[in-house]
Amino acid sequence: MKSFVFKLKALSRLKENKRDVALSQFAGSIQEVEKLNTKLTEARDRQEAVFQLMQERQKGSFRGQQIQSLQSSLDLECELISKIELELKQAQEIKVSRREIFLSKDSEYKAVLKLEEKQKEAHYFQENSKEQKELEDIIGARFLFQRINRQA
């Protein structure tokens, strides 16, 4: 029986490499979203801390400069939060896009693998059929040989 050789092996490797690249880009996008979520949580915590400090200072005696300084810190944190939220939204859109790209590349790769499997099955079926036919021919020839020898 001849061994099976997949003639599209180079295509299979190419599809696999493209799938792996798409997967690593998708994983990078997930990490970026997680990093930005952490950054956003930290910024909100800082904003809350400044806000709490400002409220404490307003209850007791305070100087106008202190409150003004705290207000500017609060404004800066608000701006930072807005910036991070925008970056997070963009990163999530990129993540969704890269996920779709990965799923597409994965589907293409799996289609080539399925084709290889079908061709392998067809090859083995064909080789098995050839062997069966050869065995039948040998059995038929032996039968005829024995028959001829008996008649002679």
Predicted regions and their residues:
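Charge-rich amphipathic alpha-helical interaction elements
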Residues: 1-152
